[in-house]
């Protein structure tokens, strides 16, 4: 069992990583006998985990209700969020309740925002079931729902009480979702840890084969890297923005194409290559390292370019609504060298368009 702490003073919390954690109600700290909880999941995961987890928590003396939401990024909306509030109110949950987010990034973001909002804030536990949510979205307290004009535009910074990562969940993960998660894994190597990037080059096939030791190390290292960044910059005023490598381009793809048509990691992978091409045009990040990034993303089953039906100019309106835009100036996360990145302010529109075209060639 691995345990990492996200250090945020009195709001610090543990990340626990092991196989079989969902079989042990004690994993869901700080829930104790006599507590009430609302388990939030989706209709794809409910048949796999819902009944057994509710039964184990009930046997441990926790009063558990549940709400099952429709699966998919297109359902990360205010309308679906209201279903969580309705379930909480219908079952008379008060400020002493705990929400359990059992699912991938959509459920984690949505249930976390529900917890931040319900009665001005209740406790919640992240129980991520996808690789992407285990290595990224469950850690750090970003919660949100989407708007038709932009991804994650309505939300709050709100930290969980704990993160419970059961490695066994990955055994039921579709291959496309696994590849999507690997995009976020590779991101950490590009922006923060060149040695980890090299480890990924050596161990990618083991990860794709769901080799337990490789997965455990990979997830632990990603969580360590993100925990350090969040501890230093919780509200994304500086270093934390680096975690958005590829996301400004990627969110444009997700929004333009309709939520759910491109998985988040698929869009981020394309966005990372666009950021790499922009960095090359600005005279940073070597051709050799750009080729290493491209090769690793391809081995992970990820695309190097955006949708064929999306013109380069289509990206710009979406990118200008990005949360990193300040005073009408676009800010892009760009790699400098492998393991290092920067936030570049005022990247010209023609440079953005050229970087997208470079990935279409």
From Swiss-Prot:
Reaction(s) catalysed by this chain's protein: 7-phospho-2-dehydro-3-deoxy-D-arabino-heptonate = 3-dehydroquinate + phosphate
CDD domains: DHQS
Record: residues binding NAD(+): 71-76, 105-109, 129-130, 142, 151, 169-172
GO-annotated molecular function: 3-dehydroquinate synthase activity; metal ion binding; nucleotide binding
Subcellular location per the Swiss-Prot or TrEMBL entry: Cytoplasm
Keywords: Amino-acid biosynthesis, Aromatic amino acid biosynthesis, Cobalt, Cytoplasm, Lyase, Metal-binding, NAD, Nucleotide-binding, Zinc
A single GO cellular-component term on record: cytoplasm
A biological-process GO annotation: aromatic amino acid family biosynthetic process
Main location group: cytoplasm
Binding site for Zn(2+): 184, 247, 264
Recorded metabolic or biological pathway in which this protein acts: Metabolic intermediate biosynthesis; chorismate biosynthesis; chorismate from D-erythrose 4-phosphate and phosphoenolpyruvate: step 2/7
SUPFAM superfamilies xref list: Dehydroquinate synthase-like (SSF56796)
EC identifiers of the protein: 4.2.3.4
Secretion signal span: none
Cofactor(s) the protein requires to work: Co(2+); Zn(2+); NAD(+)
UniProt record similarity statement: Belongs to the sugar phosphate cyclases superfamily. Dehydroquinate synthase family.
NCBIfam families assigned to the protein according to its UniProt record, in alphabetical order: aroB
Name listed for the protein in its UniProt record: 3-dehydroquinate synthase
Lineage, highest ranks first: Bacteria, Pseudomonadati, Pseudomonadota, Gammaproteobacteria, Enterobacterales
Originating gene: aroB
């Amino acid at each position: 069992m691995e345990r990492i702490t996200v250090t945020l003073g009195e709001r610090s919390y543990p990340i626990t990583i092991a196989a079989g954690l969902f079989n042990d109600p004690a994993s869901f700290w700080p829930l104790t006998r006599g507590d009430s909880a609302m388990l939030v999941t989706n209709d794809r995961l409910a048949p796999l985990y819902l009944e057994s987890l509710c039964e184990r928590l009930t046997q441990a003396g926790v009063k558990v209700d549940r709400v099952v939401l429709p699966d998919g990024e297109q359902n990360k909306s205010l309308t679906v969020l209201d279903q969580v509030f309705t379930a909480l109110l219908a079952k008379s949950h008060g400020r002493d309740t705990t929400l359990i987010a059992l699912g991938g990034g959509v459920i984690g973001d949505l249930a976390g925002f529900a917890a931040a909002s319900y009665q001005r804030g209740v406790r919640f536990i992240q129980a991520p079931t996808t690789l992407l949510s285990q290595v990224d979205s469950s850690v750090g307290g970003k919660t949100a729902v989407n708007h038709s004009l932009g991804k994650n535009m309505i939300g709050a910074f709100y930290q969980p009480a704990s993160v419970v990562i059961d490695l066994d969940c990955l055994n039921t993960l579709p291959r496309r979702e696994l590849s999507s998660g690997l995009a976020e894994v590779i991101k950490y190597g590009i922006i923060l840890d060149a040695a980890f990037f090299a480890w990924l080059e050596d161990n990618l096939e083991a990860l794709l084969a769901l080799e337990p030791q490789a997965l455990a190390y990979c997830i632990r290292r990603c969580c360590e890297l993100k925990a350090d960044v969040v501890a230093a910059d919780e509200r994304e005023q500086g270093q934390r923005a680096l975690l958005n490598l590829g996301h400004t381009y990627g969110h444009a793809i997700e929004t333009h194409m309709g939520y759910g048509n491109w998985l988040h990691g698929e869009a981020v992978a394309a966005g990372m290559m666009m950021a790499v091409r922009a960095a090359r045009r600005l005279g940073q990040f070597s051709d050799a390292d750009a080729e290493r990034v491209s090769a690793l993303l391809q081995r992970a089953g990820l695309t190097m370019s955006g949708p064929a039906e999306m013109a380069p100019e289509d990206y710009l309106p979406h990118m200008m609504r990005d949360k990193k835009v300040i005073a009408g100036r676009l800010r892009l996360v760009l790699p400098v060298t492998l393991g290092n990145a920067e936030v570049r302010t005022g990247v010209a529109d023609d440079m953005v368009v050229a970087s997208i075209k470079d990935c279409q060639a």
